[in-house]
Amino acid sequence: ETQQMASWSSGTEPDPTEAYVPNYFSINEQTYPTTLEDPNALVSVALGDTCWIAIANHGQMDHILHFHGFHVEVLTSNLQPTRIGWSKDTVPVKKGEGMTVQLVANQAGIYPVHDHNLIAVTNAGFYPGGMITQIIVDP
C-alpha cells in the first residue's frame, strides 16, 4: 500500500507486479522513538509483577521480537501452537499471527525490546526507528 500511495502521489500508476516492500514498521501504530512516549507502545510494570503482552502481526512479513533482560513464556499462538510453553528472550511472530506472552518482572531497570529483522528497526531505511520500545520495571 505504501508503494501504491507513493506512485499515486507522484502521478504514476502503481505496478501491481512489483513486490510490496514495506519501509515503516510500528508497535501499536507508533514508530521509535515515539514508542517511548506512548503507554500503549511500551511496557511499564512494578518489580515482582507478572504481565501479559498481546502481540498481533498484521504486517506482510515475519518478525522476531527480542526481549532484553527477560525470558517471556508463550501462552497462546494461533499459528504456532507447538511453541506454547516456550520460555525464550527471542520470539518469532509470523505474519498474521496473534500470540500472548507472559513476562515476570524480576529485576528493576529499563530494557529494550526490538525486532531482530533489521529492516524493521528503521524508519524509511534510517536507523534507529521502527519496532523498538522498552520494558520499564520500577523498583
Segments (PLM) and residue ranges:
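Copper-binding active sites and cupredoxin-like electron-transfer domains
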Residues: E1-P139
